[in-house]
Amino acid sequence: MLNDREKILTALREKPLKIYEVMKRANLPNEEACQSLLMKMRDEGSVKFDIHKGRWHIGD
């Protein structure tokens, strides 16, 4: 079974997504937990946030 980090990375492989799209594709019911995890992953460099488009994508 995939953990939440793997689910998020799998969801973002196709294209950059907004927070609600990430939650829907990764099947995460709690917005706050999802956003908190995305922020941790951003700090680690695994994902990035485009402030102009409001979308998350896999870090380079």
Roles of regions detected by a PLM:
Residues 11-15:
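Short helix-to-turn junction characteristic of helix-turn-helix DNA-binding domains
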